[in-house]
């Protein structure tokens, strides 16, 4: 099992890093991104609590909260875990999630 960061999630990680770096410095940005990846690694072992994505999103998958962000993921057809997107708690999540779904 591998963790696959999908394109939209990769773009969100870049945005999170830049925002955090610009606001609180590179050390904090590095720590936050490292912590996010550590959380990704805990998905398979259930070291973090994930919840099913609500039916109104129209996609099978799960999400968990990490600090001020929600991480959305799903099991890929080969069994790997796909990180679909990462959204800030203030974002209108339903619209952003639909925008970030792979086409």
Where in this protein do the model-derived segments appear?
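Enriched for short, Lys/Arg-rich terminal
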Residues: 70, 74-103
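Basic/aromatic recognition patch in beta-strand/loop cores that engages polyanionic ligands
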Residues: 49-80
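Juxtamembrane helix-loop transition sites at the ends of transmembrane segments
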Residues: 43-46, 66, 95
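Basic, Lys/Arg-enriched alpha-helical interface segments
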Residues: 2-61
